[in-house]
Each structure stands twice: as C-alpha cells, then as structure tokens.
Amino acid sequence: MASPADSCIQFTRHASDVLLNLNRLRSRDILTDVVIVVSREQFRAHKTVLMACSGLFYSIFTDQLKCNLSVINLDPEINPEGFCILLDFMYTSRLNLREGNIMAVMATAMYLQMEHVVDTCRKFIKASEAEMVSAIKPPREEFLNSRMLMPQDIMAYRGREVVENNLPLRSAPGCESRAFAPSLYSGLSTPPASYSMYSHLPVSSLLFSDEEFRDVRMPVANPFPKERALPCDSARPVPGEYSRPTLEVSPNVCHSNIYSPKETIPEEARSDMHYSVAEGLKPAAPSARNAPYFPCDKASKEEERPSSEDEIALHFEPPNAPLNRKGLVSPQSPQKSDCQPNSPTESCSSKNACILQASGSPPAKSPTDPKACNWKKYKFIVLNSLNQNAKPEGPEQAELGRLSPRAYTAPPACQPPMEPENLDLQSPTKLSASGEDSTIPQASRLNNIVNRSMTGSPRSSSESHSPLYMHPPKCTSCGSQSPQHAEMCLHTAGPTFPEEMGETQSEYSDSSCENGAFFCNECDCRFSEEASLKRHTLQTHSDKPYKCDRCQASFRYKGNLASHKTVHTGEKPYRCNICGAQFNRPANLKTHTRIHSGEKPYKCETCGARFVQVAHLRAHVLIHTGEKPYPCEICGTRFRHLQTLKSHLRIHTGEKPYHCEKCNLHFRHKSQLRLHLRQKHGAITNTKVQYRVSATDLPPELPKAC
C-alpha cells in the first residue's frame, strides 16, 4: 500500500527558477565557461545552456576536438544585436522581436540552427505583412523587375549547363546562379553585410495568381529584346526545343526545388520540367551570365559574391551535416508544435538527424488548418508586442515600410515551370485570381482589427470593402469617425463596439432616455451622459447601503461599517491578553495571537516554509518566481512587496512619519523607531516573546511600541 511519501510531487516553477538562477549567474559572471565573439563583441555564457538551445553549439561542444574551446568566434556577418537577443532568449525564454531587428534575429537563428525561433520570426513577418499586401502590392511590371526577396522565399537553385549529346558536365562559373545576397536586402536600411543568407529556404506564397504567374514563367513567344541575353546562355544553343522526356534528362540539368513551408516534397517525387523555347531565338554570347528575365546591371554584378552559407561552412560546420534540413522533422519532434525548441538529438547537426535522413524516413505533414495553432497565446504574446511597439512613422520608416513587404523576382530562365501541385498550396496567405485575399490567417485578422481600431490609420480602397474592418460609427455631435474619439468626446452616449453597447443597454435597460437626457428610475435624477447615470447608480442605489460619513466607502453589512469607522477614530477595542497590543479588528487580534502560540498554518509548497498570515505566504512565493511587480516611478527600482515600495518612496519624498514622543526625533521607517526605543529608552518592542506576565502587570513607566 503506497504511502503519501511515495507520491510524485510536481514543482511547476522549478524550470523557470533554474533558468532564472542561470541568468543571474551569467549576469554576475559565475561559472561561465565560454566566450562568444561576434564582430569584436564578447558574450560570456554557459556551454550547457548554449548546447541545449542551439544545434550549432551542440555540434561544436560534442566534438572531441572542439569541446574544450573557451573562445569561439562566430561568422563576422552575424549581427551582434541579433545574437544578444537570442542569448537573452536562451536564458529568459523571452524573445524581443521588433520590426527593426526581425531580420537580424532570423538570420542569426538560422546560423545557430534554432529552428523554432526561425519559425516564430516567419510568423511574425507574415502577420505584419498580411495587412500591407493589398495596400502596396506592386504592379505586374514591378513584379518582373523586382530584385528583393524575403529570407523565407529564397529558392535553392544552382545553375548548371544543359548536357547535350552526352558530353561531360563542364564547370561554368558564368552560369553559377546562387541567390544574390546583397540585392536581397536592397530595400532595407540595414547594410546587407549584417545578415547571413541561406539558399535552402522555401518559397511560401506568391503575390500573383497561379495563372498570372504561369504566364510569366512560360512565355510562348520570344520575351527577350534582341539586345538582351538569353537565360542560361553558357549552354550551347540547340535549334530544336529544349524539352525532353523526363527519363532522358540528366540529373545535372538546372532545375529548382520549390518547397512548401509546411511540407517537404521527396526528391524522387518531383518531375523535371523544362522550357520550350521557340526556334527563332538568337543565341547569346558565351560569356554572359545566367540571369532572370530582367537584365543585371554592372554594378550589381560587381557586388555579387557567394552566399554566406559558404562562409558559415568555414566556421564550425558539422562533419555530417544533412543536406535537406526540412526532411529531418519526425512526427514526435517538438518542432511540430509552435515555438518549441528541438532537442539536441533532433537538431539539424546531430548524428541522429543524419541517421534519420539516411534511413529515408518520410517527412511528416503538419496541420494546415490555421485553427490548429494556439491563436490565443499568439495574440497575447505577438500582437500585444506589436501594438506596444507601434510608433509614428517618419520619412525613413515610411520608405522602409514601402519596400520591406514581400516582393519577388521573376524565376530564372533556367528554372523549369512547376506544376500547380508543386506550388505553395498550403500557404496560410493566398491570393485568388483577382488579386484579393482568399484566406487570411486568423492571427493576421486579429492583427488587422486590433491595429486599425487602436491607430485609426487610413485604409486603402481595397481595404474599405473588406468585412474584416470594423467601421467605427460617426459621432452624432461633431461627426468624427476616429476610434479614440468615442473615449474622449463628451457628447458620446455609449461605447463604440456593438457588443459593449448591448451590455450597457442590458445593464441599464430600466433607465429611460429622452432627447439625450438620462433619468434614474429610482430617484428621477437627470443626467446628460449615460456614464454619469452609471456612476450615480453605483454610488446611490447599489447593494451596499451602509456608507461612511467621512469617506466614500460603502459596505453591505452594518458591522463592517462599524469596524471601518475605527480607522477614522483611532479606536482599538481589541486587546491582546499576553502582550497588551491593541487592534481595531478582531481578525487582526486573531492573527496576532499566532505570534505567541507559534502557530503557522500557511505553508509554502515549494520550500516548506510556514507563515502566520496568508499575505506573508503570498509575498514569499514571489521569491521563487522572481517576480517584482512593483516598480518605482521615479528611479525605476522594482520591489517584490507593495509595502517595500511605499517605504522606498519616502527616500524620494523625504517623509519621516514615525517620531519618538520623548525626544521628538523622526524616522523614515518603523523599524528605525523601534530600534531607537530599544537602545535609547529601554522599551520592550519584541512582542514575539511568549510573555508569562500579563499586560496589566507591566510597569507603567515602560513604554511599549506596537
């Protein structure tokens, strides 16, 4: 038979307490065993924490040749601010995302192989861009000439020559067409060198419909002017068509793999499709580079360089790093749940991940239904931070907001047209053939409604017909339609939103309203505003009829009012029989007697400490949680208890409310007065002693402090 001692006790705050203590050790530089150098900035940390959170550090410290390193230099292109945010996230589980640092954090998270952070950054970007797509969607010409891609939309392609007549594949650097890293951030204010680029990221959604995009990618006639180079021009021209049966195509033929953000298509399931080019096309010069439909200027060619993935490989690259990282996720992996980190064994660089890939385990599909995610938690964490960080846009920020939304380059000419099923059919944000939003994620809808209702920003013509926008009614007095106007205008009779109006009308349905005047049915008082009627009803006709004649306090029972009046009169009729202390309420006397009896009925479940009052237990629990909810508005110091904050405020105000009646000295804190009475006047202030003598036997000349 199991005894209570055999049961398992779950400490809910243990994990957060350990993380808090580790962060304190890091801040005090205690037992930190590694220094991370990022662009000449040093960050001290613990190897165990880095290994538990980052796949890159896990691969470093599990290597026998690198496990004893005390200084690690990361890639010079890693942004120190992004790494600092991720390091704080490792120790606090709080990710500080803003529009200004989202790209740096995302690039650094990719480099550190923190997939759960990358997914969160992608959701942050999608949520912020969904409301701007319709307002700033570029026309078709801008779409063809655009050079900017968002990091999650970089396609993994590498141009190679078409093998003709079974000739061996030649090394053609002119046709090498990796993603152009500097141009990806040409629309951002941050220098492109601050971010690392990766060529394995999926294309999530398109700005145009499938039919419109297919017209762009599959030209029937000659789409190039005579002076413009053909795509994949380093390949030898063939008078016939380029298209061949799939089985005859060499695997080295240039093709692109377009992945869905929710699903990885197996390599053998993809079909290679090639363009059918007309016979009358002119061959291009052999030295011309492989280019998309738009011509590349010389300046951009001079800036072109290999992607940062090669530079990252120069630093700690795992020996058996998998090629396709998306295919490593198992159905039981924590990555399948939102914002959950991979365990070290499931990280991209781990040996188990390589084994999983070698075994050919099929990738699992995550749920595509937007309702499968926890939108309540997303709304509380992400949307609230978006609203709090909202600032008025200046000229630079307005230009950044115009260029930062998702824009796509036309696919390179050597890229085959993909079938509709290979396109992003599971993307949360889709566009129909007419260009309108067909399905928008629930988080984006919440974001649109909250931001528009709080900021009152002007809407575009496409948004004006959207059913998602809640139009605030015009003010009947001044005609304003601002959402904030309902709270500030004195002529507004009720709240803005219909559900609030329904609650107000149901609560005060027994009151009458005539010609804008509100009458109370209890006493026939007249008010010009419904808020004044509500205030009058609560103060006059509430269920607390007993009111204090000295203050605005009201009580439901007469005895509570009598106890309250002792606060004003200073009367303390309840006396302790042991020490003589007096109290104005019997409950306070009952609590006081526990000091003499030694009874401590309130126990802390975390550490087992016991307390006399439940308020003391609540204050003690904050020690384990690390919470300090009471900040000083003057100096910013935070306190665990409200009384400590009140005592601290006396330092700023100079108040000294406690004074000695014998020598007329004033003290800021009660403890200082009690110490003064004991040392200077010999008073007995320690009431915790179990006195054997009653209070009536105490000498009259001996002062007593409460």
UniProtKB/Swiss-Prot annotation:
Expression tissues: Expressed in germinal center T- and B-cells and in primary immature dendritic cells.
InterPro entries for the chain: BTB/POZ_dom, SKP1/BTB/POZ_sf, Znf_C2H2_sf, Znf_C2H2_type
Effect listed in the UniProt record for changing S333A: Decrease in phosphorylation by MAPK1
Residue numbers carrying Phosphoserine: S333, S343, S361, S404
Induction comment: Down-regulated during maturation of dendritic cells by selective stimuli such as bacterial lipopolysaccharides (LPS), CD40LG and zymosan. Protein levels decreases upon genotoxic stress in a dose- and time-dependent way.
CDD domains linked: BTB_POZ_ZBTB27_BCL6
Superkingdom of origin: Eukaryota
Assigned GO CC terms: Golgi apparatus; nucleolus; nucleoplasm; nucleus; paraspeckles
Residues covered by the BTB domain: 32-99
Subcellular compartments: Nucleus
Keywords: Acetylation, Activator, Chromosomal rearrangement, DNA-binding, Immunity, Inflammatory response, Metal-binding, Nucleus, Phosphoprotein, Proto-oncogene, Repeat, Repressor, Transcription, Transcription regulation, Ubl conjugation, Zinc, Zinc-finger
Gene Ontology molecular-function annotations: chromatin binding; chromatin DNA binding; DNA-binding transcription factor activity; DNA-binding transcription factor binding; DNA-binding transcription repressor activity, RNA polymerase II-specific; identical protein binding; intronic transcription regulatory region sequence-specific DNA binding; RNA polymerase II cis-regulatory region sequence-specific DNA binding
Presence of the UniProt keyword Nucleotidyltransferase in the record: no
Ranges annotated as C2H2-type zinc finger: 518-541, 546-568, 574-596, 602-624, 630-652, 658-681
Annotated region (Disordered), positions in chain: 317-349, 407-467
Subunit structure: Homodimer. Interacts (via BTB domain) with the corepressors BCOR, NCOR1 and SMRT/NCOR2; the interactions are direct. Forms preferably ternary complexes with BCOR and SMRT/NCOR2 on target gene promoters but, on enhancer elements, interacts with SMRT/NCOR2 and HDAC3 to repress proximal gene expression. Interacts with histone deacetylases HDAC2, HDAC5 and HDAC9 (via the catalytic domain). Interacts with ZBTB7 and BCL6B. Interacts with SCF(FBXO11) complex; the interaction is independent of phosphorylation and promotes ubiquitination.
Name of this protein: B-cell lymphoma 6 protein
Organism field: Homo sapiens (Human)
Gene: BCL6
